[in-house]
Amino acid sequence: MINEIGQQWRGKKWYCYGTSMTDNSVRPGRNAGQLFDGQKSSPDRTGFYSQYLAEYAGLEEHNFGKGGKGIVPALHKEDSIKSRVMTLADGKAEADLITVEVIPNDAKAELGEITDWSDDTFCGNLNQILAYLLENTQAFVAVLIATRSRYNPGKRHHPAGEITQKRLRWEDAVEKICRMHGVPCWNGAAEANLGFFRVGLEQKYVYDQIHLTEEGGRVLAKYFWGKLQTVYPLR
């Protein structure tokens, strides 16, 4: 049961951008990930955290998440998260809250340096996205990290494994860029208690070693809701 101590976001317009972790209309493909032993099928959608965060906070949700997409245009053609964010055609000028969920689906890109503004690197595109939102809207802007991308029982995904260590380097870069721009980074992958030893070995919170189950989405939403209660709309 969510304790509704924070009412400041009730009725406010939330524009959310991101991957399949955010997109609550996605029907995962058969090759989205590997089911755990005993699982016969995948849920018909993902992005559960966005549904529950909107419910907990009383937000008017405008969901522009897109499964399989990232912020680096070279990897995602014309319809990238960046192209969805860097336009006012969707009405975001009236948004009270804008969140951009990042990292999944950009792993093949070059990370780059945190001071980079290039179209070719992850850091460069994140810098451009944040500058655009701060210059063109009066919304409260936050960057979200929802997952470490794959919760696999193999040793590469162990907390000390090479995959996790790579993700940590990317998360560190995101957090530093957010500090540079004066916006928060809410890192659910690091802080929502959905780590390897809780979710990597069974199916309660993650159903295909990638996407959160509905229960996992609720846990992540509660984490983000806790963060949201500590800040207020700018207008």
Predicted feature residues:
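Residues at the starts of beta-strands that form the adenosine-phosphate
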Residues: K13, E60, A139-V141
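Residue-level detector of flexible, active-site-proximal loop/helix-junction positions
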Residues: M21, G67-G70, R148, A192
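Conserved SGNH/GDSL esterase-like catalytic core that processes O-acyl groups on lipids
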Residues: Y15, N24-D120, G124
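Polar low-complexity intrinsically disordered regions
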Residues: M1-I2, E61, Q128
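N-terminal secretory targeting modules
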Residues: M1-R45, E55, G91-D96, E135, ...
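Residue-level preference for alpha-helix termini and adjacent loops
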Residues: S20, G70-I71, K204, Q209
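Alpha-helical cap/lid subdomain in secreted, periplasmic
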Residues: K82-R235
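Mixed-charge, polar/low-complexity N-terminal
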Residues: I2-N3, F36, S41-S42, P73-L75, ...
